[in-house]
C-alpha cells in the first residue's frame, strides 16, 4: 500500500510539473506577443514625434519672418516723423523777434506733448492692426494641432492600459508562483515571489498579507507587524488584519498595543465570535495575570468551535490556570487528558512535569518525586525538572538533603545556564548550609540574568541580614520595594531589620504595612502584637508569643526574616516555552506567592571555619557590577567549577594552623631530647675528666647528683609540655566564650548611624533620645570599621581579647623554644624575643581580621587578598620558629663543645689537684643545671593556671609603654655619652693599677687535706637535700596562709619604696653636683695609695658589646664574682679607696637603704620557710642569674687579668668584636649577724596594680638621670662590698616575664671565663678557704630555694587579684547600649 501511494504521489507530482511547464510556455508566448505589440507601438509613437517636430520648426520660421517685417516698418515711420518736425520750424532773422519767438517756442514746446500725442497714437495704430492677423494665424495653427494632440492622448491611454494589464498579469503570475512555492513548503522562494509581486504593485494587499503570514509562521513577529501595519494604513476597517496585528504585538510582549489592536478587531469584524481572536485575548489576560478573564476567554473558544485546531493547547493553558488558582483537582484532570496527546511543541515529559508540580503543591511529595523521575527517564537533561527536584530536596521536611539539592541544581545549570531561577534556588540551598560566600555568588548570577525580580533582591537582603551587614540589607530591601511595593514579605523582613536594631517605631510601621498587604497571615499578626506589647510595656500573653523567633522579646534573639517562595514553573504563555518545555519567564505574579518554611535561626557569631565566608561585597558593588556584564558567563562557569571543590584558601589556612601546632609540639619534644643529650654529654665529659685524675669516689657522687638533676629536669620539661598543650586549649575555649559573650554588643554598636533618620532605641518608658544620638555618630572608615569614640566599645574589647589570646599562644610557643636554650647568651635571648614579638604582631592582625565585624563596603577582591596575607604571615611565622629552633640547637652544641675543649686544654696546660678538677666539674655542671632550671621555671610560671587568664587592658598598655621607654633610653644621646665616659675611666684605671700575675703552685699536702674535708661536706649536703625533698611537697593551704601574710608586708614595703622614690628624685640634682667633687677626690686617693703599696683589686668583668640586631647600644657591663678558695687579709677602708669606677659611691648610697629592708624581711622569712616549704619546690626552681655573696670570717684579694676571645658567634645576631675582660677576685671581711642574709639579684620590686602611670614614669626618669641600675632591680652585693662598682647593661625586659632582667643573666662565654679564673685562683689558696667556701655555698643554695618559692607565691597572688578586677569590669559592661537605624520605612513608600 505504501508503494502504491508513493507511486500515485509521484504521478501527481509529474502531472503538476507538466501543468506548470505548460503554464510557463503560455506565459512565455503571451510575453512575446506583448513584446511585439510594444515594439510596434513604439515605432508609431516615434513617427508621430518626428512629424510634430517638423511642424514646430515650420511655425518657428514663419514667426521669425513676421518679426523682421515689423522692424522695417517701425524704422520708416521714425524717419517720416523727423522730416515733418524739420519743416515746421520757421527761420528767425531779426534779433528783436528772436526773443518773442523764443518765448513762443517755449510756450509751444510746453504744448507740444499734448499736441503730439494724437499723432503718436495714430502712428501706433498700424502695428496693432498688423498683429491681429498674426494671432489669427496662430489660432488656426492650434486648431490644426488639436486633432493631433487628441490622437497622441488616445495612443498614450492605450499604452497605459496595455502596461497596466501587463503589471496585473505579472502580479498575478508572481502571486501564483508564491502560492505554489508555499504549498510545496519552500517559504524562502514564496517570500521572493511575493516581493517581486510588490515591485509591480506596491499596494497589493494579497502580497502583503501573504508576506506577513509567512513572517508570523517563522516567528519573526516584528517584521510581520510591519506588513500588517501597512495593510491597516491602506484598509483601516479590516478586522481580520487588526486581530493578526494584535497577536503579533502579544508575542512581542507589547501588551498595550496588543490590547488596542484586539479592540479595533472586535469593532470592525462583522462577527466578533471568532475563536482565533478570543484565543489571543485569553493569552493576553493570562499575561496580565487576570486568570479569571483568561479562563472565560479560553472556555468561550471551546464553545465557539469544539474542533478548534489549538484545543489541546487551550486544555494545557487551562490546567496551568487552575493550578495557579488552587483548583488542583481540575488541573490534574486537564493534564492527565493531555498525557497521550500533548500539544506541540510539548511532549509527554512536559505534561508529567506539570503533574509532579501539582502534586508538590498538594504536599504529596512522594507522588511528585515519582512524576519527576519519570521525566528524567525520558530526558535526563530536562532543566526545569532538575530545578524542581533540587528545590524539593531543599525544603521538603520528609527527605531533606542539601547535597542532593545542590547536585540537581548544578545539573540544571549545565543544561540551561541562562535560567535565573535555578541560580536563585542554588543560593537558597547555600544559605541553609551557612555558606554565605557561595550564596552571594549564586544570587549575583541570578540578578545578572533578571535584575528586576524583587524576589531575588529580597533574598539578597536576607543574606546581608544574616551576616549582620545591616546597611547592605536595607539597600536590598529598598530595591525590592521599588520594584514591587505590594509584597508583604519584603515589608516583614524590613520590620525585622528595624527590630534587630531596637528601632521599634519604624519596625511597627513596616509590620503594619505587611499586615495590610496580607491580613490573613497569623505570623505577621502575632509578631505585630508582641512588638506593640513590648513598646507599651504591657505583659505579653501566650497568644502573643512568637515561638519561632524567641519567647523573650528582644532578649530572645533576633527574629528570623520571612523568605519568599520562588515562582512555580510553567506559568508563562505557551509561546514562551521552548522545545524542551523550559519556561524562562520569572514574573512575580503580583505577589501571589505562598510562604515556605523559614530558615533556622543563625547565631550572630560564625564558627572559625566559616569566618572567611562572612565578608561579602556591598550592595553598591553588586549594583555597579550589573552595569558591566562582560564577565557574566565566566563568573557562572567559575561558580559551577567551585561547587565540586572546597575553598582552597580556608583549607590552606587550617593546614597552616595545624602545622604551627605540630611544630610547637615537635619543638617541645626536640627541646627535651636536646636537654637530655646535653646532660648526658656533660656526664660523659665529667667521667672522662675524673678518670684522667683517678678520682673514682668523687665521680660517683657527681654522677648521682647529675642523674638526680637530670631526672628533675626531664620532669620539668614534660610538665611544661603538658601545660603548654592544656593552656593552649584553655585559652582557645576562653577566647571563644569571650567572643560569644561580646558579639551581640558588636553587632549593635557597629552599625550605629545606618539609616538617614536620627532615632534612638526607646528606653524603658518608650521615649526616644533623638537629640543625644547626633553627638554619638560614628566617624568610621568603610574598610576596617573602627569606631572613633571616647568610650570603650565592645569592638575594642573583642580586639583586646583576640590580642591577649594570640599573645598567650605565642608566649607559650616562645616558652617552649626557650626551654631549649640552656647556654644561650644575652644576644640570642633578645633575638628570640624579637622574633616572638613579630609573631605576635602577625597573629594579632590575623585575629582581628577574623573576629572583627563585617565591613559594609568591602572590595570584591579583598577576600582573596586577605587570604594571601594570612598565608604569607603564617609562612613568616613558621620560618621564624624554624630559625629560632636552629639557632638554639647550634648555640647549645657550640657551647657544650667549647666548654669541653676549654676544660681539656686547661687540664693539659697545668697540673692540678683532684680537688681542683672536681670543683671545676661541679661548677660547670651546676651552671648548666641551674640554667636549665631557670628556663624551665620561666616556662612553668608563664604556663601556670593563673597566667593563662587574659591580661587586663591597663597592664597591656603599661607593658607597651615600658618597652617603648626602655628602648628610647638605650638610644638616647645622654646614655651614649655616659657609656663613653665609663669606658675612658676603665682604661685609665687599667693603666694606673699594677696587675701582678701569680705563678705559684699549691702544696700537694694542703690539697689532700682539703679533698677529705670536701668529701665529708658533700655527704652532709646530700643528706640535707634528701631531708628537704619530702618537705617540699607541703599542702597548698599552708602556702595560701603564708602568701596572705607576705602580701600585707609587700604592700607596706611598696608604700615605703614609693616615698623613697619621691625623695630621691628631689636629691638627684644635688647628687650630680657631688659626683664631680667625689670623682676628683677618689682619683687622687687611688693614685696616692697605688704609689704607696700595690693593692689587689676586686675582680670586675667589663664587656663592651656592639649594637645588637635592632641597632640598640648596650652599655659596658661590669659583674663581680667571689672566689671561695682565695684568702688574703684586707680592710674595708682600703677596699673603699680602690674602686675601679666612679659610680661606686652613688650606688652604695642607693643600695644601703634597700639592703636594710631586705635583711629584716629575709630574717623573718627564714624562720617560716624552715618549717614549711611549698609544693611548687618539687616541680620548679627559680632561675639563678648570678652567684650570691655570703659573709665570711676571713678575706683575701687576688688580682688576675686575662683577655678572652669570643668563642661563638650567633648566626642570627650581629657579630660582636673581641671582648676584653679584666677579672679580679675579692672577699670582704664582715661580722656574721643573725639578721644578715644573702641578697637576691633576681627579685623585682614591682609597683602595685593600682599604681598610677606617673609613678612608673618617675622611676624611668630617675634611671635616665642617675644612669644607675633601675630601682625596680635590687642591688647585687652586700653592704661590705658597696665600693665595688657594677654597671649592668640596660636592656629591654623580656615580654614573657618582667621579673627576669636580661641585663643580669650571664652569657656562656662569661661563665666559662669565670670558671677558669676561679680554677686559676684556687692554686694559690689555702685549706681553710675551701672549708669556709663550702659551708657558705650550701647555706646560700638553701636560701635561694626558699626565696624562689616565696616569689612564686607572690606572683600567684598578683594574678588572682587581676582576675578579680577583670570579673568586676565584665559585670559592668554586660548591658551595652544599642545602635539605632536611621531612615524610616515611611520614606521608602515615597
From Swiss-Prot:
GO terms for cellular component: nucleus. Residues 540-557, 632-641, 745-803, 857-871, 977-993, 1000-1029, 1037-1099, 1120-1135, 1147-1169, 1206-1218, 1240-1263, 1339-1374 have a biased composition (Basic and acidic residues). It comes from Dictyostelium discoideum (Social amoeba). InterPro entries: Corepressor-Demethylase, TPR-like_helical_dom_sf, TPR_2, TPR_rpt. The gene is trfA. Associates with tupA to form the trfA-tupA corepressor complex. Its main location: nucleus. PANTHER family: LD02225P, LYSINE-SPECIFIC DEMETHYLASE. GO terms for molecular function: chromatin DNA binding; RNA polymerase II cis-regulatory region sequence-specific DNA binding. This is General transcriptional corepressor trfA. It is found in: Nucleus. It comes from the Eukaryota. Residues 53-143, 539-596, 632-938, 958-1390 are annotated as: Disordered. Induction: Expressed at the vegetative stage and at an early developmental stage, although at a lower level. Residues 1136-1146, 1229-1239 have a biased composition (Polar residues). Residues 582-593, 644-744, 805-846, 872-898, 917-937, 1170-1180, 1192-1203, 1219-1228, 1277-1289, 1315-1337 have a biased composition (Low complexity). Belongs to the CYC8/SSN6 family. TPR repeats lie at residues 171-204, 206-238, 239-272, 275-308, 312-345, 349-382, 384-419, 420-453, 454-487, 489-521.
